[in-house]
């Protein structure tokens, strides 16, 4: 497996693969990899000849400098895991290479229809940072396919819209959320949980699934459902952050024409902000 840190070497390798007619898959990450990331790599391997994994802690995605400073950097361990799963290249650039003009003078890519609603409303600039770095990586690596986890539902929707609007010829693949045996969605931030908090954490998904079941049975009092879920989270020990029920396709409020809903949940447990989502078929 190749490990490349500079743009010239990356471009040279991508050019070589293109000349050889190789189909390229991309898995963008911020490192601190877990089994959920490995599932993305495994999926990518089924869809391309070579798999590029990027490891870059993107400063544009962090609102708080302390959060950026404390984000785990585990490049050596990450590369060992990726070698075992058959990745072909790890691109791990420095921020100065990705943003040579500095963050203040950086040219941004924004998807305003999705970047400022829901989670974006409380995290200004976050999704603009996501779309900017993903666009840069698409331009640098020129993948045929790119794999993203469905756990970050709004992020995946934003990337799909960016690809459609910007005319990228890239197949975006959403990969189902990987969970621990007790139902907790795998996340790099789970490492912030204490032992006691880790025992509580699966309640987030259980409360979400109970809400989804009520909706599947025909309950449509959205405000009441969300208030009940928030109360359950508080009783379990969480601090609710974001609770939404939206049209799964548009991320707008449900209408009589909505065929599928998505429940979007985010809650703090200690120092960890946990997120999850669940689709609900409304056609019954």
Curated annotation (Swiss-Prot):
Keywords, A to Z, come to: ATP-binding, Cytoplasm, Ligase, Nucleotide-binding, Pantothenate biosynthesis
Which superkingdom? Answer: Bacteria
Query: Where is this protein localized, as stated in its record?
Result: Cytoplasm
Gene Ontology cellular component annotations, sorted alphabetically? cytosol
Q: Which reaction does it catalyse?
A: (R)-pantoate + beta-alanine + ATP = (R)-pantothenate + AMP + diphosphate + H(+)
Chief location of this protein within or outside the cell: cytoplasm
Q: Which positions are catalytic residues?
A: 37
The record lists beta-alanine as bound by: 61
Record-given protein name? Pantothenate synthetase
